[in-house]
Amino acid sequence: MEQQIHITLQFDLAIGKVNLNEIVYRLEQLKNPLMLEILKTILTGYDDLMADRLSPQSGVMTPSKMRKGLGRHVRKGDPNNRFCHGRCIRKRGYRQHLRVLSTVFGKLQLPLRVAECRVCGARHSPLLDALNITPYSRKESNFEHEVIEAVIDTNYRRLVEGRSIDISLGGIHNLVVGSDVDQMAPAASVDLGDLAAIMADGTGYKRQKGEKGELRSVIGITTGGKVEPLGTFANTQWSDIEQIVKERFKQTKAAGIPFIYDGEPGLDDFLADVTESQRCTWHGPRGLYHSMWEDGLRKNQSQPHIDQLKHLIGIELPKGDYELLKDQDKAAVEDKYRSSKAEIAELIDVFKEHGYQKGATYLENLSERIFTNIELWLKTGVIAPKTTSLLERIFREIGRRVKRIAWGWSDATVTKLSKMIILKKYSKEKWEQYWKQKLGINGHFSIHFVHAELRPCHNF
């Protein structure tokens, strides 16, 4: 049903003195009050339309087809809260107090009509049911959307002061707790054939009562270079995470893609039946420093070995189509790969001779998993990631929010917030799809601007 809203705006313009900036400034101030008034006009008009269709006009009822979906209410006195079949009402005025709802435009003060069912006598508000507003709801979901996006994009102080969103820190917590974002990841929804690599890492955060917590995340990198979130978990064992992640795969056969990690305990055999383990080439030398420090070496003593390791694992792969590369280019990479492995083996022997057992053990474990990306390229020509830098950036985004806003929150709530951050920042299509479904955007309402006309004011 099409209707029009006629708006009258009056402005006072100082001829020859006003500038564009002041005009835009005043219009910006008018935006939210104007949107609230338009919203209120639409809703009151909708309420009047429903009341007219549900009540007899000159003793004649509106055809049932025109009343379909309107006036639903629970039958009065029914112990099972079943719906009444009556769709005919008596108008009983309006509720004594206005209904206040938080919206993205501000506080909406809405008068609610009271209707009395002619069949069971129950009193209800047809508008609330038609708009899917629960009896005790005090906000609409676009407000929740605005708050969640603001939390992801900025810190709490700027959220309140910069965006003028009236909500407490506890209110943000309640929105995140009540979110159903954790239901977005259906089982068997990810095809391993679409992934170029999988990464996993963890970061610390402050739990309730000041205890230290561990937030862990697993992501996939698609062949198109996009992030495919595979799961975020708070204080969960890697073995349990592995089982949950596997349930998201359409198949769990070996895919020949690298699993990149920083050497964290518990990840050496993570997803070993579907991926090939690849140690992060940035964390590799860093870990050697710590191992040799445990052997008693200081930085100036271990630095030459660290520099040597960086050189050995820093094999650059030729760019371009693998099939078009010259045989000598491929052979050069393979020669460099074999010589690097041999030199690392020699370095391990040197460490053992000098009694650097921690360093030797570390290098032995590292050498088994540091060249996976090279081996994959030699077999298939696929250039896979070799560092966890992307996941590190994601954790920096998560850390800024979790450590400043979500400190002291429960594990489940921190998990939800981190999932929201990953989706919003790195999987925008899924994020938008989630909110469209949550907000019920189904094409049942549209509004557009028709025209603006300048008329003389009668006060001039």
Name each model-derived stretch:
Residues E2-G16, G93-Q96, K107-L108, L112-Y136, ...:
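RNase H-like nuclease fold core
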Residues E2-V74, D78-N81, Q251-Q278, Q303-F460:
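Acidic/histidine-rich catalytic cores and adjacent linkers
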Residues L39-R138:
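Basic, low-complexity segments
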Residues R138-T154:
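Short, amphipathic alpha-helical "recognition" segments used to contact nucleic acids or chromatin
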Residues V151-G162, E343-I344:
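Short, charged amphipathic recognition helices of the HTH superfamily
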Residues K212-L215, S291-Q303:
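Short, surface-exposed amphipathic charged segments that create phosphate/polyanion-binding patches used
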Residues L267, P285-L288, Q301:
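The catalytic "switch" region of P-loop NTPases
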Residues V274-G296:
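Inter-helix linker motif
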